Amino acid sequence: MKTPKTVPEVKLSWEISADEITAILAGSHSNPFAVLGVHQAGDAFVARCFIPGAEEVTAMTLDGGVIGELKQLHADGVFAGPVSLTKLQPVRYRARRGDAEWAVTDPYSFGPVLGPMDDYFAREGSHLRLFDKMGAHLIKHDGAQGIHFAVWAPNAQRVSVVGDFNNWDGRRHVMRFRSDSGIWEIFAPDVPIGVAYKFEIRGQDGVLLPLKADPFARRSELRPKTASVTAAELEQEWEDEAHLKHWRETDKRRQPISIYEVHAASWQRRQDGTMLSWDELASSLIPYCADMGFTHIEFLPITEYPYDPSWGYQTTGLYAPTARFGEPEGFARFVNGCHKVGIGVILDWVPAHFPTDEHGLGWFDGTALYEHEDPRKGFHPDWSTAIYNFGRTEVVSYLVNNALYWAEKFHLDGLRVDAVASMLYLDYSRKHGEWIPNEYGGNENLEAVRFLQDLNIRIYGKNSNVMTIAEESTSWPKVSQPVHEGGLGFGFKWNMGFMHDTLSYMSRDPIYRGHHHNELTFGLLYAYSENFVLPLSHDEVVHGKGSLIAKMPGDDWQKFANLRAYYAYMWGYPGKKLLFMGQEFAQWSEWSEEKALDWNLLQYRMHEGMRRLVRDLNFTYRSKPALHARDCEGEGFEWLVADDHQNSVFAWLRKAPGQKPVAVITNFTPIYRENYSIRLPSAGRWREILNTDADIYGGSGKGNGGRVQAVDAGGNITCSITLPPLATIMLEPEN
């Protein structure tokens, strides 16, 4: 043991008043930094501490030098005394009780970590690296290593961080309040990575709230536990520069994008029914998607959520990948593995609302902090959730920073923003009298509009490789147009009209389809009003809707033929593609989050044929610029047959500058049609590059023998083709 230094006589009182001792022991002292820790007393220094269970306390420097013996002021663990120091500095204590001895580094002897500029930018809402400042971060500070905790709770009387490291005692680590920003912070020395913690908050009324998880937590406990967990900074060795460079430098509207939508918890399961880890998913999902030709994987929300049947859409931890699949590093490895084989990763992201679980954001500091206080703006009647207050700069900053966090830290390629329509309209799912008009008397949520515009400006400004996709179900204009042109600034928008109209048409018996011909032609009137993604998503195979194959009419053969024809129709239609897992092999049953997909179906010819078709559609779509380069521009489309409602035949030409055109022809009746005359743009031989009725896909094998001949009859170029029943074919000129 090092020799104790001489302790100078302290002329000023180093003791603590009885009232302050009472407040410290009761956990009601709002600023223990003013009392505990090291303080100057005249020309000398004193140390005061609160160490429950201690009978004796010796003060030391961080390197172990003894600087004084402290006097017990209260039997519950309050000590104080003069210490031999020449300046304010952090100290450590050696505490004893009987034969037990332990060391405690004093959190109140450390200065603040955040600075005035952090306060300024946080309050202004322009801090774009809040995720490096807020939450829990392992740092070295004033010579010690530990966790810096920071949380926004401007209306709280007192905030403490509690966890495994202090026996969940809210009196031990009461945080320092930064009045300029409303942020509370504390550096907790010696706290390691991997420990659970929450915030204990005393509200405005002096009442303790339920313990709160960290809004900026980067890791959480596995449900049903709800605590946040201290996490190290990601140390992923990224090997994806070529992938990122490609998407930074290309016009995404002119690239092939075919998205495989995945619920990570139910794509596959282990034999015992438990969920796969990220590494297990990487070993199976990535090669599967690469083989299938999908360009992107879009995950249903993977941010931490407490309730499995919510599928992740009611998140309580926007910054933490859910613990269901392992640690955050596992997800980073998954993304890196995708990028190495050229597959992008899109996150389904939920900034519209949050659940009211008591450990979450609701009434976070005893007031409506993240949500509107008025339920007409702050409560969502459809989901019984709270709505973010988009008019509060700190809340907008929290959400924008979260989007930037996923793009920067995890190299995500896109964010699909959920429930945009519910954000845009003040009267969404509300009756008369249940909503508040905007300042102009309208139903537009102008604060949400500004948030979405700011979100897209920030994302594209800092991460041009990332794309944002809006799930917006109304006719709100210019969703995917630039902000400077009055748009919301999204890269793409889901085409809900396409999904609704085409599935409505396909569910009809073919004998009646002729009466509903316009359900398919109508969509081309607005197909280029936005940059569209055509979504056959999870929403279409849940809540009693059945699977896609189950929606098709007819006997089993006709159901499969209908779905094959529909898929090829969609892959030939202008717009990017999205297909929910299991639908690529025509799973019969409705999707359930509780179990894996019915992979056993692939042993059957018709299901394996469907999978092969989707695979071939993806590679055809990707390899033929005519099918993707003008997905979002009208010049890439030309009707060939638009009004043959009697035969339910549709045909069009897909085009791209300097590339061979592709003719897409669909027969939506079970009638085998020979010698069907169709106009084509050039004479000569046209090759059949895809036929959904091919035997390898489970079809009847009817077609055109691989090619057709277009003849120029006085300037009118036509060809006579065979249209298989319930089938789509694609043709391209040989020369």
Swiss-Prot record:
It holds the Pfam family Alpha-amylase_C. The active site is at D418 (nucleophile), E471 (proton donor). Catalyzes the formation of the alpha-1,6-glucosidic linkages in glycogen by scission of a 1,4-alpha-linked oligosaccharide from growing alpha-1,4-glucan chains and the subsequent attachment of the oligosaccharide to the alpha-1,6 position. It catalyses: Transfers a segment of a (1->4)-alpha-D-glucan chain to a primary hydroxy group in a similar glucan chain. Pathway: Glycan biosynthesis; glycogen biosynthesis. Belongs to the glycosyl hydrolase 13 family. GlgB subfamily. HAMAP family: GlgB. GO terms for molecular function: 1,4-alpha-glucan branching enzyme activity; cation binding; hydrolase activity, hydrolyzing O-glycosyl compounds. GO terms for biological process: glycogen biosynthetic process. Keywords: Carbohydrate metabolism, Glycogen biosynthesis, Glycogen metabolism, Glycosyltransferase, Transferase. Its EC number is 2.4.1.18. NCBIfam families: branching_enzym (TIGR01515), PRK05402.1 (NF003811), PRK12313.1 (NF008967). It is an enzyme of class 2 (transferase). GO terms for cellular component: cytosol. This is 1,4-alpha-glucan branching enzyme GlgB 1. Monomer. It comes from the Bacteria. PANTHER family: 1,4-ALPHA-GLUCAN-BRANCHING ENZYME.
